[in-house]
Amino acid sequence: GTLFNDINIQRRNSAGVITEQIKVPIEYSAKDKMLLHIRRMSTTDASVQTTLPRMGFVLNGITYDGTRKLNTLGQVYAANTAASSSTLLKQYNPVPYNFDFELTAAVDNAEDGAQIFEQIVPFFTPEFTVSVNLVPSMNVKPDISIILNSTTTEDSYEGDFTTRREIIWTFGFQLKGYIYPDVKSGSVTKSV
């Protein structure tokens, strides 16, 4: 979700002057629950409605990725900076997993949806790579690839004039990550 914290919408008047700038809120929420909340708030009381645009994301699945597997018994070592210099930290190799995420953006007009689309898609060609400090004690900072697999849009343009229009953009992502085992502490062998 942090990757999409800075999505903003600009509304302009007929002269092209920016009249409003909206930071699009994001929450951890499945698409169905987010839509149910929007619809419920739209029908129960006209004076209290959910503000659009808004975004939600959810983890859809985790699968093992054998194509990136490392030697199971391989270990990484690092000096223990939190203790005396005679200790060593060790950790077995991580296990590769793919994490499938879905990002949903709900808007009430096509222009807002297009602006969100334009702030996300250009960074994924089709993948975006970030360096993450996953295990600070071991100084493990791998490059993590996030792949944009799909983009779809739904428009509920049918209905009477009292029905709120919903345009839903759905982005499917796959994060190529790792699960790391525990870090163990041991002593340094000074002579054999």
Positions of predicted regions on the chain:
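Small/polar-rich, solvent-exposed N-terminal microdomains that initiate assembly or binding
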Residues: 1-75
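Extracellular/virion structural assembly segments
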Residues: 6, 62-63, 79-98, 107-129, ...
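Membrane-lipid interaction segments
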Residues: 28-37, 41, 71, 76-93, ...
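Short N-terminal helix-initiation segments at or just after the protein's N-terminus
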Residues: 35-51, 111-119, 176-191
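Homeobox/homeodomain signature
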Residues: 45-47, 89, 163
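Oligomerization/assembly interface segments of phage tail-like spikes and tubes
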Residues: 53-61, 93-109, 118-120, 165-178
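"Short basic amphipathic alpha-helical interaction patches in structured regions
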Residues: 69-77, 116-123, 135, 188
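Acidic-leaning, charged glycine-interspersed low-complexity segments
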Residues: 82, 93-96, 115, 125-190
